[in-house]
Amino acid sequence: MCWAVGRRWAWAALLLAVAAVLAQVVWLWLGTQSFVFQHEEIAQLARQYAGLDHELAFSRLIVELRRLHPGHVLPDEDLQWVFVNAGGWMGAMCLLHASLSEYVLLFGTALGSSGHSGRYWAEISDTIISGTFHQWREGTTKSEVFYPGETVVHGPGEATAVEWGPNTWMVEYGRGVIPSTLGFALADTVFSTQDFLTLFYTLRAYARGLRLELTTYLFGQDA
C-alpha cells in the first residue's frame, strides 16, 4: 500500500515538473515572438470611439486597423458575428485578427450575461465601447465596474467573475498561447449547448485568421 501511495506521489511530482518546464518553454517562446499589435495601441484606438453607437465605432475601428496593419485584418467577406458560450455566460464575437500568439476581436452582448472569465496562458485586455463591465477578482470580496473608454486587463493565470450589462460592447486584444484559450471558449458549446454549427463558425474564423497571417508572411501584404 505504501509503495502504491509513493508511486502516485511520484507521478504527481513528475506531472508538476513537466507542467513547470512546459510553462517556462512557452514563456521563452513568447519572448522571441514579433507581435503585430500592442495592448496600448488597441486600447487607444478603441477609446477614440468609446461612447459612439457600437456598430459605427466598430466600422471605424476596422478601417483604422486595416490602414495601420495592412495584411493583418480579415477582409469584410470573412468577418462574421458568432455566438460564444463559455464559463456560463453568452456573448458574441467578431474575429478581426488571429495567429498563434495574438488575436483582436470585437465582443459583446445585447442582453447582458455573467459567469467565469476562464484562466488562460495569455493576457487579455478589453476596452469598452458601450455598456458596463463588472469584474470580481479572485481573492477579493468586492467587485469593480468599468465604463466606456476604460480598459480591463486579465493577466495570465488569473480568474475572475464577469458580468456585462445589456448592450455592452468592447474591443478585445489577446497575447499569449492563443490555441490554449480555445478549450475554455468551446467547452460549453461542445458539452452544454451542443451547437456544433457555432463550433464550426468559431474554428473557421480562427482558421481564416491563421491563413491570412501565413499568406501575408509568405507573399507580403498585397497577396
UniProtKB/Swiss-Prot annotation:
<feature type="topological domain" description="Cytoplasmic">
    <location>
        <begin position="31"/>
        <end position="223"/>
    </location>
</feature>
<keyword id="KW-0813">Transport</keyword>
<keyword id="KW-1133">Transmembrane helix</keyword>
<dbReference type="GO" id="GO:0098839">
    <property type="term" value="C:postsynaptic density membrane"/>
</dbReference>
<keyword id="KW-0770">Synapse</keyword>
<dbReference type="GO" id="GO:0030426">
    <property type="term" value="C:growth cone"/>
</dbReference>
<keyword id="KW-0966">Cell projection</keyword>
<dbReference type="Pfam" id="PF04622">
    <property type="entry name" value="ERG2_Sigma1R"/>
</dbReference>
<dbReference type="GO" id="GO:0070207">
    <property type="term" value="P:protein homotrimerization"/>
</dbReference>
<dbReference type="GO" id="GO:0006869">
    <property type="term" value="P:lipid transport"/>
</dbReference>
<dbReference type="GO" id="GO:0031410">
    <property type="term" value="C:cytoplasmic vesicle"/>
</dbReference>
<keyword id="KW-0812">Transmembrane</keyword>
<dbReference type="GO" id="GO:0005637">
    <property type="term" value="C:nuclear inner membrane"/>
</dbReference>
<dbReference type="GO" id="GO:0005811">
    <property type="term" value="C:lipid droplet"/>
</dbReference>
<keyword id="KW-0675">Receptor</keyword>
<feature type="transmembrane region" description="Helical">
    <location>
        <begin position="10"/>
        <end position="30"/>
    </location>
</feature>
<dbReference type="GO" id="GO:0016020">
    <property type="term" value="C:membrane"/>
</dbReference>
<feature type="region of interest" description="Targeting to endoplasmic reticulum-associated lipid droplets">
    <location>
        <begin position="2"/>
        <end position="8"/>
    </location>
</feature>
<dbReference type="GO" id="GO:0070161">
    <property type="term" value="C:anchoring junction"/>
</dbReference>
<keyword id="KW-0965">Cell junction</keyword>
<feature type="site" description="Important for ligand binding">
    <location>
        <position position="126"/>
    </location>
</feature>
<keyword id="KW-0551">Lipid droplet</keyword>
<keyword id="KW-0628">Postsynaptic cell membrane</keyword>
<feature type="region of interest" description="Important for ligand-binding">
    <location>
        <begin position="99"/>
        <end position="106"/>
    </location>
</feature>
<keyword id="KW-0445">Lipid transport</keyword>
<feature type="topological domain" description="Lumenal">
    <location>
        <begin position="1"/>
        <end position="9"/>
    </location>
</feature>
<comment type="subunit">
    <text>Homotrimer. Forms a ternary complex with ANK2 and ITPR3. The complex is disrupted by agonists. Interacts with KCNA4. Interacts with KCNA2; cocaine consumption leads to increased interaction. Interacts with RNF112 in an oxidative stress-regulated manner.</text>
</comment>
<dbReference type="GO" id="GO:0005640">
    <property type="term" value="C:nuclear outer membrane"/>
</dbReference>
<feature type="region of interest" description="C-terminal hydrophobic region">
    <location>
        <begin position="177"/>
        <end position="223"/>
    </location>
</feature>
<keyword id="KW-0472">Membrane</keyword>
<dbReference type="GO" id="GO:0038023">
    <property type="term" value="F:signaling receptor activity"/>
</dbReference>
<feature type="site" description="Important for ligand binding">
    <location>
        <position position="172"/>
    </location>
</feature>
<comment type="function">
    <text>Functions in lipid transport from the endoplasmic reticulum and is involved in a wide array of cellular functions probably through regulation of the biogenesis of lipid microdomains at the plasma membrane. Involved in the regulation of different receptors it plays a role in BDNF signaling and EGF signaling. Also regulates ion channels like the potassium channel and could modulate neurotransmitter release. Plays a role in calcium signaling through modulation together with ANK2 of the ITP3R-dependent calcium efflux at the endoplasmic reticulum.</text>
</comment>
<protein>
    <recommendedName>
        <fullName>Sigma non-opioid intracellular receptor 1</fullName>
    </recommendedName>
</protein>
<dbReference type="InterPro" id="IPR006716">
    <property type="entry name" value="ERG2_sigma1_rcpt-like"/>
</dbReference>
<dbReference type="GO" id="GO:0005783">
    <property type="term" value="C:endoplasmic reticulum"/>
</dbReference>
<keyword id="KW-0539">Nucleus</keyword>
<comment type="similarity">
    <text>Belongs to the ERG2 family.</text>
</comment>
<dbReference type="GO" id="GO:0043523">
    <property type="term" value="P:regulation of neuron apoptotic process"/>
</dbReference>
<dbReference type="GO" id="GO:0005789">
    <property type="term" value="C:endoplasmic reticulum membrane"/>
</dbReference>
<keyword id="KW-1003">Cell membrane</keyword>
<keyword id="KW-0256">Endoplasmic reticulum</keyword>
